[in-house]
Each structure stands twice: as structure tokens, then as C-alpha cells.
UniProtKB/Swiss-Prot annotation:
UniProt GO BP: cellular response to starvation; filamentous growth; filamentous growth of a population of unicellular organisms in response to biotic stimulus; filamentous growth of a population of unicellular organisms in response to starvation; sulfite transmembrane transport
Record family assignment: Belongs to the tellurite-resistance/dicarboxylate transporter (TDT) family.
Keywords carried by this UniProt record: Cell membrane, Membrane, Phosphoprotein, Transmembrane, Transmembrane helix, Transport, Virulence
Name of the protein: Sulfite efflux pump SSU1
Stretches in topological domain Cytoplasmic: 1-108, 159-176, 226-244, 295-312, 375-438
Source species of the chain: Candida albicans (strain SC5314 / ATCC MYA-2876)
Biased composition, class Polar residues, residue ranges: 15-47
GO molecular-function terms, A-Z: sulfite transmembrane transporter activity
Amino acid sequence: MSSSSHNDNKIPPEKTTTPPLSSSNEDIYNPADSSNVLSSNQTLVSTNNNNNNNQNNNQNNNQNNDGKDTMDHLSYLSTIDSKRREQSYLKSFYQRFIIEDVVKNFTPAYFVSVMGTGISSSLLYNFPFPAYWLQICGYVMFGLTCTFFIGNIILLIMSCAYYPNRFRDYHVDPSRAVFMGAFSMGYITIVNFIALITKGEHIYFVWTLWWLAVFSAMYTSFLIVYLSFMSKLNESDVEAKLNATLLLPIVAITVVSSSGHSIELDLPHVHQTVLTMIVSFMLWSLSISMAFMVMTLYMGRLIIHKIPPTNLIMTSFLPVGFLGQSSYSIYLFGNNLNKFIPEELLYGKISLCLSGFVSVFLLSFGYFMCFVAVTSVLSKIRPFAKNPNPSHTNRFGLLKLEKSFWSMTFPMGTMSLSNTEIGHGGVGNYPLLTFKVMGSIFAAACIFITVGCSIGVVVYSFKKLREDMTNKNKYRNESMV
């Protein structure tokens, strides 16, 4: 009994069999299967989350690596820059400041300062309403002119010596080559002042200097204009650089023409006077023919593309310089013919009248271009400009004092010369006070702008020198620490 009951109480283990997937068409629910599915889904979700986390971590790592690479690159550049500064300050003052700063940044445009101071010295010495103290100021200004001229000549030679490619650029590149005309005109202003103070003495010395001026003017107006704008040596976009600065090499022959007319009557022999007179008139005719071609292109560009940008706005005064100087030259020619030809002949009077008409015609055009230039400058400053260019204007909306201000000096001076000469009343021996007053106004404007620009040059030079010495001392102190 006991054994049987004991055997009956034993429950055999249940055999659980998993039906095959193909046993029937119906789905059979099994809790174990659902738990397995849930666990597998959780596993997939966790796997996806891990993958997403890994991707995010990889992206963060990539971003961190990119940021690190950027920081490393910036630190590398700063290290290179600091090493360059360190190496530069290890050099001598001559190599560091003179060669790598002054000579490296030199351009022939610096000769515009010689033009401005040179014509200002002549205006001070021969002011429309003369005074002795003005003549003394003229001598001082002439000394400044010679200083600028000699300094720029030295920089020009050093620039071509240390940077040989620049000699080609000074003849081919339109943005640089045209300013070689400023070199010629600056030299001619020195010759003019020497002719004023010698008053006919040492005329052969002055005449020799004038022939050198003729050669330099012809060199710039022929060779440089051809190489920079007509030859195939220049592969740059000339149309983009076609502005009023192209007049600079051409105005040089106008200036040397008027210089010849101012000394021709002091020559002792008739054939020398006639030769100088004819050559000077030919130079004036050449400048008129070339300049009016350029003026046509310039006016067309001005009408189509409107006034120049702020950094080139001062070039609007360059046509004024050509018109004023050509007016002055042709009037001197007619006046000299009237004095040279005997009075019993009418040819001198006729030549004076014709030259006077042409001179007034050119002067009137000069007044118009002066109006265009002044209006163009005013349009770049407040209150006429709503949004002045911040890189060229100060916080008051006015133009900053820059090197381009030198472009105003010589044109104002030429307008003064022309007005003053007409005001002397050569035609009919009748002085014209109005033109003398206008000549005084233009002369005062030229002199004041020249003085301001000269002060700016001195201040800028001392500022650069002090900055170099300060950085040198700073580096020396850091290296000692």
C-alpha cells in the first residue's frame, strides 16, 4: 500500500514541446516566446542606442578634433608670426626698417609730394599779391621740395636694387608706371623755381636743366604710355585701371612746355629763343592731342560707371591740372610772341589774341572739371553721403587724411598760375582783378593743402619710427625675461 501510494504520489515531469513553425497555419501564443521577443527587441533597441551614442561620440570627437586642429593651426600661425617678428627684430635697423618697410612700400606715387611742394614754392615766391614774407616762405618750401625729391630718388634707386622686378613694374604696370610722370613734373617744378630766383642769370645752366626735363617728359609720355597701355607686355585688365591717373605722363610734357616759355626770352641768342619756343609749342600741341583722347575715354567712363570709389576720388582733380597747365602754357606762348615780334608787325598781337582765346577756353573747361571734382569729393562725406565708406572716413563722416590728398595740390596750383597770368592783362594791357583774386584763392588752397599733407608725412614718419622702436624694446625686454 505504502509503496503504491508512494509511487502514485510521484508526478512525472512534463514534457514541453515547441510546435514546429510549419505545423499549422494558426499562430500559437506562448509566453516564453513573447518574453524572448521582448528581450530580443530590447537587445536591438539597446544596440541601436549604443550605435547612436557611438555615432554621437564619434561626431563629438571629430568636432573636438576639428576644433583642436583649428586651434593647432592658429597656434602654428601665431608661432610662425612671432618667429618672424623675432627674426625681424634680430635684424639691424637698416635692414628691418629702411629696407623691409620703407623701401619695400615705396611707389613712384611718392613723387606727387615733390609736385605739390614744388608748385607751392613758386606760388609763394610769385604770389598774385606779393609780399616779402611770402618769398621767404617760398624758399622754405623749396628746401622741403628738394628734400622730398632727393629722398624719393634714393628710395627709387634702392627699390630697383633690392627688388629687381620693380624696374619692369615701373614701366609696364599701369597702376605704377603712370606715376613716373610725377617724377618728371616734380623735377620740372624745381627747374622753374631756380629760373625764378636766378632772374635770367646763369641762363645756360637753367636751359640745360630744362633740356633734361624735356627728355624726362618725353620718356614718360612716349615709352611708359606705350609699354603700360599699348604693348602686349602688360597682361592685366587695363580697362579696370583706366582712370584719370593716365593723364600724369601726358601732363608732364605740358608742364615742361610752360617751363620753356618762361625762360625762352632770357636766352641771349635769337636762334636759341626760337628753338625753345618751337619745341615748347610742339610739346604743348602733343599734350593737347594726347590728353583730349584720354579725357574722352575718362568722360565716357565717368558717365557710364559714375564717379570713382572713395579710394580713387582724389584722382578727379587730375584733369583740372592738365587744363590749368595747358591754359597757362599757351598764354605764355602768345605773350612771348607778342614781345618777340617787332611792334610794327601785327603778327604778335594776332598771336596774343588767339592764344588768349584758347587759354580762356581751356581755363573755362578747367573750372567745370574743378566743380565735378569738388562735388564728387563732397558726395563721399556727410551729410551728402548716407553711408560713407568706413575705411576711408572718420567717425564724423569726413575723409581721413591720406596720401591721395596730394593729388589736389598740383591741379590747384596750375589753376592759380593760369588765372594769375590772365589777370596780368597781357591782352590790351588791361589788368583783370577778378582773375588775380581767383588765382589767389587757388594758390591759397594749394599751399594750405600742401602744408597739411607735409605735416601728415612728418607725423606718419615719426609714428612709424616710434612704433618700430617700441616693438624693438618690447621684444628685448621679453627676451631678457
